[in-house]
A protein has these predicted regions:
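ATP-binding/phosphotransfer module of carbohydrate and carboxylate kinases, centering on a glycine-rich
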Residues: 1-156
Length: 156
């Protein structure tokens, strides 16, 4: 779990690998997921991107990532107490095989271009994804820098 290893004990308790109050550890990660999900939902309104959780926190994703995405998809209540869609898009847990498949599949439709016999493929599903880093920051930066250098040389 990298630099975040100071909290590895909590992860291990939550997974049943260490003696402790497993229910409390799982609840702590659920609460973390809700807070992180709320923060990402607020930030994602400014950005058109997927979210990648990295560092040591990524190692504990099995205990909180579902709660992050659930919170992002939860509606907010308006002044009348009625639910209002929080995000313009649907958030997907990219670490869940079923959700990843749905994210990648989308809702592709073939539509006719008005005034012609031509058709185009269109995917109207607005979506974002939340996943974890597998490369690590140093390697990801190095790969990005290399790709950028190649593009500047005209070799990419």
């Amino acid at each position: 779990m990298g630099r975040w290893s100071g909290f590895r004990w909590l992860y291990e308790i939550g997974c049943g690998l260490r003696v402790g109050n497993r229910k409390a550890a799982i609840r702590a990660y659920r609460d973390l997921g809700i807070v992180v999900g709320d923060s990402i939902a607020n930030a994602i309104t400014l950005l058109d991107t997927i979210t990648v959780i990295g560092g040591g926190l990524a190692g504990a994703h099995s205990l909180f990532l579902k709660h992050v995405v659930d919170e992002m998809n939860n509606p907010l209540l308006n002044m009348n107490g009625e639910p209002a869609q929080r995000l313009e898009m649907k958030a997907y847990n990219l670490e869940d095989v079923k959700e990843l498949d749905e994210f990648l599949r989308g809702e592709t439709k073939v539509i006719t271009i008005p005034g012609t016999n031509k058709t185009i493929t269109h995917d109207p599903l607005k979506r974002t994804g939340v996943g974890i880093s597998r490369l690590g920051t140093g390697k990801a930066v190095a790969i990005g820098a290399y790709a950028y250098a190649l593009s500047q040389l005209g070799e990419a």
